[in-house]
Swiss-Prot record:
Alphabetical UniProt keywords: ATP-binding, Cytoplasm, DNA damage, DNA excision, DNA repair, Excision nuclease, Helicase, Hydrolase, Nucleotide-binding, SOS response
The keyword Metal-binding is assigned to this record: no
One Gene Ontology term of the molecular function aspect: ATP binding
One Gene Ontology term, aspect cellular component: excinuclease repair complex
Domain of life: Bacteria
Pfam families on file: Helicase_C (PF00271), ResIII (PF04851), UVR (PF02151), UvrB (PF12344), UvrB_inter (PF17757)
Subcellular location: Cytoplasm
Motif (Beta-hairpin): 97-120
Protein source organism: Streptococcus pneumoniae (strain Taiwan19F-14)
Residue span(s) of domain UVR: 626-661
Protein name: UvrABC system protein B
Entries under InterPro entries matching the protein: Helicase/UvrB_N, Helicase_ATP-bd, Helicase_C-like, P-loop_NTPase, UVR_dom, UVR_dom_sf, UvrB, UvrB_inter
GO biological process, alphabetically ordered: nucleotide-excision repair; SOS response
Length: 662
């Protein structure tokens, strides 16, 4: 039995006070939520402190909150910020726990079966368990998640019902406790004590919860009664304190009791017989043999161990769901009255919409060729309409809300004023005739002031030709294309900020991690060619790249002004006018953002024995690459420990790149 604490409050800790138009945005959002409004949009310009506004809203409405970002890196940044704002509350992180993931697939054209291959990040697995257990134990919970939160997770009821609840004075034999722990997928290991394991020493049982990484619990028996429970350091055994009540959550999210397991196995066997009959009728004997062999092995594992690799493919039977019924997800672990905030909603909602179809087409291939039972199709992400059915109240957060969000609500709350006083940049349109020489003059003017320039083109060839030309003209320039790996990309951004070069040319400069305060000029070539990066939203986002510098300026090179251009220019001018009026009224002088340039030498460069001499990774031999991977792995763990998930994700990608050279 879990005693859920429902009366605790969110406590926001910050040296800041709401400023600019934050107070009115906070007040409107809170009033609308308390008034029962289902959906609203926070349309906040880049750099206006949207995360702080979100934190203020959470603390005032006091509801469990799910914040969804469109990738792990952004989720990590938000998690770090919310942890700082709410040190006394449960701020949790829920993303895919795979460092590397190759889904199970089959390619009929080459008769290639690709087995599921993955590397699970133990730290992220711990954080996922921490998130689900926190949601069942308390009310003051913020979970920052990627879109993996709409994937199947197992039944929250089974998860909660499987909790082993212990307290001093409870009559339970030691052996009964050991059996209970094994039932919820804990593993006995008296030597290697890790998360999800327990060890036994006489009348003492030590349990290492799946949601912890340093602290375990020591349960001491007197006969068939628990004498006392103490929290201890897992490594040293040092006692940290007495515990009145201990709830041990399952070591896996896919858990079921013996009765339900027998029912599930019977259903799996019945479905197997049905599908074998279909294959035999169609003359697919190879597929029938394959399916029979795989499924019978899985059934044996479920019967003996209560678990098998790929157990999630049988989740429909284990959860007792009907065919086509949506799976349980993280959203089902929240109470009914919870709040959802979608960060960068113009990107995230598109991802939520697209998840189902991609998963379905891959799984259908596996079913058709006898690698999985048809019920595996119900181990899937939610459809968008299924996601919508979970929404009680939602806030879409974006500088450029998408069509979907605008269809959901007419309530749009603006946040335009930046705490730094920075204005949206001035935007002008210049003709394409003589554009390169015109741009060269603008770049030279920026170089003299030690400022940087972004140039965005539409084609790879244009970007390459432009880069070559500017190099001939003596400009320090680099081209960032889609083939550049994380390792090099991180280095390029750092070198741009340090002034190793002055101009960065690219096609898509909207990806995360490309916010550079030193950039005072953004040049948009072919601005009148409508498309993904030249529509209104794309242009506004690109213009925002110059909004972190007090000298920010944008030049669009075009022969005609498209509707998208005009709307982007008008919107930027409207915001700029409001910002200037506010600054004038309050005597604020815009200040360029001062952002520390993180030293990435240790992370991005292989350093030879002569400490200062940097070497190219491609020139390293196999042993040196192996040593570098070890170093990077250590640095990744250090980054995770200090909750710097952005850096950890970068290092992880670098490790994969170094490993790929072998």
């Amino acid at each position: 039995m879990i005693n859920r604490i429902t009366d605790n409050k969110f406590k926001l800790v910050s040296k800041y006070q709401p400023s600019g138009d934050q107070p009115q945005a906070i007040e409107q959002l809170v009033d609308n939520i308390e008034g029962g409004e289902k959906a609203q949009i926070l349309m906040g310009a880049t750099g206006t402190g949207k995360t702080y506004t979100m934190s203020q809203v959470i603390s005032k409405v006091n509801k469990p909150t799910l914040v969804i970002a469109h990738n792990k890196t952004l989720a990590g940044q938000l998690y770090g910020e919310f942890k700082e704002f709410f040190p006394e509350n449960a701020v949790e992180y829920f993303v895919s726990y795979y460092d590397y993931y190759q889904p199970e697939a089959y390619v009929p054209s080459s008769d290639t079966y690709i087995e599921k291959d993955s590397s699970v990040n133990d730290e992220i697995d711990k954080l996922r368990h921490s998130a689900t257990s926190a949601l069942l134990e308390r009310n003051d919970v913020i979970v920052v998640a990627s879109v993996s939160c709409i994937y199947g997770l197992g039944s929250p009821k089974e998860y909660a019902d499987s909790v082993v609840s212990l307290r001093p004075g409870l009559e339970i034999s030691r052996d009964k406790l050991l059996n209970d722990l094994v039932d919820i997928q804990f593993e006995r290991n008296d030597i290697d004590f890790q998360r999800g394991r327990f060890r036994v020493r006489g009348d003492v049982v030590e349990i290492f919860p799946a949601s912890r990484d340093e602290h375990a619990f020591r349960v001491e028996f007197f006969g068939d009664e628990i004498d006392r429970i103490r929290e201890v350091e897992a490594l040293t055994g040092q006692v940290l304190g007495e515990v009145d009540h201990l709830a041990i959550f399952p070591a896996t999210h896919f858990v079921t009791n013996d009765d339900h397991m027998e029912v599930a196995i019977a259903k799996i066997q019945a479905e197997l017989e049905e599908q074998l009959a279909v294959f035999e009728k169609e003359g697919k004997l190879l597929e029938a043999q394959r399916l029979k062999q795989r499924t019978e092995y899985d059934i044996e594992m479920l019967r003996e161990m209560g678990y098998t690799n790929g157990v999630e493919n049988y989740s429909r039977h284990m959860d007792g769901r009907s065919e086509g019924e949506p799976p349980y997800t993280l959203l089902d672990f929240f109470p009914d009255d919870f709040l959802i905030m979608i960060d960068e909603s113009h990107m995230t909602m598109g991802q939520i919409k697209g998840m189902y179809n991609g998963d379905r087409s891959r799984k259908e291939m596996l079913v058709n060729y006898g690698f999985r039972l048809p019920s595996a199709l119900d181990n899937r992400p939610l459809r968008r309409e299924e996601f919508e059915s979970h929404v009680h109240q939602i806030v879409y957060v974006s500088a450029t809300p998408g069509d979907y969000e605008n269809e959901q609500t007419e309530t749009v709350i603006e946040q335009i004023i930046r705490p730094t006083g920075l204005l949206d940049p001035e935007v002008e349109v210049r003709p394409t005739m003589g554009q390169i020489d015109d741009l060269l003059g603008e770049i030279n003017a920026r170089v003299e002031k030690n400022e940087r320039t972004f140039i965005t083109t539409l084609t790879k060839k244009m970007a390459e030709d432009l880069t070559d030309y500017f190099k001939e003209m003596g400009i320090k320039v680099k081209y960032m294309h889609s083939d550049i790996k994380t390792l090099e990309r991180t280095e390029i951004i750092r070198d741009l900020r340090l002034g190793v070069f002055d101009v960065l040319v690219g096609i898509n400069l909207l990806r995360e991690g490309i916010d550079v305060p030193e950039v005072s000029l953004v040049a948009i070539l072919d601005a009148d060619k409508e498309g993904f990066l030249r529509n209104e939203r794309g242009l506004i986002q690109t213009i925002g790249r110059a909004a972190r510098n007090s000298e920010g300026h944008v030049i669009m090179y075009a022969d005609t002004v498209t509707q998208s251009m005009q709307r982007a220019i008008d919107e930027t001018a409207r915001r700029r006018k409001i910002q200037m009026a506010y600054n004038e009224e309050h005597g604020i002088v815009p200040q360029t953002i001062k952002k520390e340039i993180r030293d990435l030498i240790a992370v991005t460069k292989a350093v030879s024995k002569e400490e200062d001499k940097e070497v190219d990774i491609n020139s390293l031999n196999k042993q040196e690459r192996k040593e570098l991977v070890k170093k990077l792995e250590k640095q990744m763990q250090e980054a995770v420990e200090v909750l710097d998930f952005e850096l950890a994700a970068q290092i992880r990608d670098m490790m994969l790149e170094v490993k790929a050279l072998d």
